[in-house]
C-alpha cells in the first residue's frame, strides 16, 4: 500500500480531533496512547497511523479507508459494524479484538498478532493474512471471498459457518483446528495437515 506521506496533517490528540470533526482525511498519528474510549460514526481516510496504542476500547459504525497501521496495539478493542477498506496492518497487535458485523475489503494483515480475535457475522473480500497469528481465534458466520493465508498460525482456531472453499492452508499451522466438514470442503491442505482433520471422518488411524 502506497499512501503519500506528503501533505499529511500531523495530529496529537485523536479524541480531540474526533470531537471537532466527523471525518478525518490525510492525517498522521504517531506515538499516541489511550484506553477505554468509545468512538462512534467517524470516518478516517488516506492516513498513516504509527506506534499508536488504543486498547480496551470500542469503535462503532466507523469507516477506515486507505489507512496504513504500523506497529499499533488495539488489544481487547471492539470494532462493531465497522468497515476497513484498502487498509494495511503491519506489525500490529490485535489480540482479543472483536470484529462484529464488519466489512473487510482489500485489507492486509502482515505479521500481526490476532490471537484470541473474534471475527463474526462479517464480510471479508480480498483479505490477506501473512505471517499472522490467529491462535485460538474464532471465525463464525462470515461471508468470505478471495481470502489468503500465507504462513499464518491457525493453531486451535475455531471456524464455523465460514466456508474455506478454494482457500490454500497448506503453508499454515492448523494444529487443533475446530471446523466442520462443510467449512473445510475444497480447501487445500498438505498431507501432514490431513492427519489433524481425520477426526472429521469419525475414523481412527492405527
Residue locations for each model-derived region?
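Tandem repeat scaffolds
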Residues: 2-206
